[in-house]
């Protein structure tokens, strides 16, 4: 019989479990927060599939980096994945602007091509590529505490995976604050942005670069498929609660905490994979927001602003 109290305290019953699970929770929070902040602008631009495209598009970059270096060390993998992610984004933008293809068709064509190329390269036996496709797709956040320790100037500084994700999360937050107005205006009205002298193309590629960095940093923990859930669920859920984009952005932090803690306890209770449990928790939180949210919920009469409807009435600050 299910016991709620036992389910909640089982994950924290010993000192070792507390240390182990805190690392998993912090990793989940940073992944979800980073993906959610970027996802706010991706969803506003009606390009939710872009996260999925870049997530799949980084696979050939990872494999090629391994084939060239024979190592899965952080540096080569990040460089290869970022180049592949930017290449995927550039291909999508080129197809969208230079051909009659719609955005969804351009993204679908590009990410399937990149992902297929990655699978073909992964199947090659050159150098005995020790990459598990299941790990790339689904990740294993539960192994975060086993990551190598970061050593600087001979001093141990803690879990390297947490440091890597922490730096990316910090960069994402700083970029969101510094470039907020540019991202907002270019997301809702590119004509206005051009009339104000904003470099629309540079901002678009900058967002793709940030997206690629977040995806690369996250794929080992939650896998490329679940990155999309972490990227879409926070902004979409909070859009039913708030009418202003700054509030939607701020809500990403408490939602990330709920996803991470809720997913961990769900995994302990049902013996599910932790990363999938975090995504399920996100869906469970989304449902009441969608049904009863004050900003366009199914059972409310207020009109939904915002993140789904474009630029009507959205304040810039």
Please give the residue ranges for each predicted region.
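Membrane-interfacial amphipathic/re-entrant helices at transmembrane-helix boundaries
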Residues: 1-34
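Hydrophobic alpha-helical transmembrane segments
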Residues: 25-30, 78-83, 105-109, 162-167, ...
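Short loop segments and helix-boundary regions at transmembrane helix junctions
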Residues: 41-131, 238-250, 267-270
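Transmembrane helix-bundle core of multi-pass membrane transporters
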Residues: 115-175
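Transmembrane alpha-helical segments in multi-pass inner-membrane proteins
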Residues: 217-276
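Cytosolic-side transmembrane-helix boundaries in multi-pass membrane proteins
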Residues: 275-317
